[in-house]
Amino acid sequence: MPLPDFRLIRLLPLAALVLTACSVTTPKGPGKSPDSPQWRQHQQDVRNLNQYQTRGAFAYISDQQKVYARFFWQQTGQDRYRLLLTNPLGSTELELNAQPGNVQLVDNKGQRYTADDAEEMIGKLTGMPIPLNSLRQWILGLPGDATDYKLDDQYRLSEITYSQNGKNWKVVYGGYDTKTQPAMPANMELTDGGQRIKLKMDNWIVK
């Protein structure tokens, strides 16, 4: 089914969800150089992951709407991933399955949509301009196409600034889960003007 030009999905705007940091390491001290071999090694270790999944809390906040949800993100291969959003009551609001050249999304009414660009689809159906194509790298602690970024004292991303298509995103990492090797982001916040996206990862499973 072709995509409509209006917002279809409306997640329950319940404020019961509080995005708090779990017991993780937080960036401290002066940052390290992006040219350091430790940072290059960390990037390589993350890129070597073939499969991974994480779940946690999601919040989108703007002047127009406030959305709170639980999310599940699973990568099963290169450019093959699944994103599930559930409302605070546990009901599925959105399920997205992506593979090269094809994206399918099922809404909370069971209606199925197809497209070739997941980011555009999410934006049209939810009204939330989530930078999904870049977020796939940022959620792993990788800069993606961004060249303006900073590292913490453990040679991990602490901040990204990225401009594309009229959007000026700033990404700030609040901590890393060191129980996972390589260490993976535990919480992060994206801002663009009056828009904010918060992600808190409860846990990671990597292979």
Curated annotation (Swiss-Prot):
Subcellular locations according to the entry: Cell outer membrane
SUPFAM superfamilies per record: Prokaryotic lipoproteins and lipoprotein localization factors
Lipidation (S-diacylglycerol cysteine): 22
InterPro entries (alphabetical): LolA/LolB/LppX (IPR029046), OM_lipoprot_LolB (IPR004565)
CDD domains the record matches: LolB
Lipidation sites (N-palmitoyl cysteine): 22
Listed transmembrane segments: none
Leader sequence residues: 1-21
Disulfides per UniProt: none
Keywords of the record: Cell outer membrane, Chaperone, Lipoprotein, Membrane, Palmitate, Protein transport, Signal, Transport
Pfam families membership: LolB (PF03550)
A biological process from GO: protein transport
Superkingdom, natural source: Bacteria
Membrane topology label: Lipid-anchor
UniProt-listed Gene3D superfamilies: Lipoprotein localisation LolA/LolB/LppX (2.50.20.10)
Subunit comment: Monomer.
HAMAP family: LolB
Described purpose of this protein according to its UniProt entry: Plays a critical role in the incorporation of lipoproteins in the outer membrane after they are released by the LolA protein. Essential for E.coli viability.
Entry's family note: Belongs to the LolB family.
Protein name in the entry: Outer-membrane lipoprotein LolB
Lineage summary: Bacteria, Pseudomonadati, Pseudomonadota, Gammaproteobacteria, Enterobacterales
The gene coding this protein: lolB
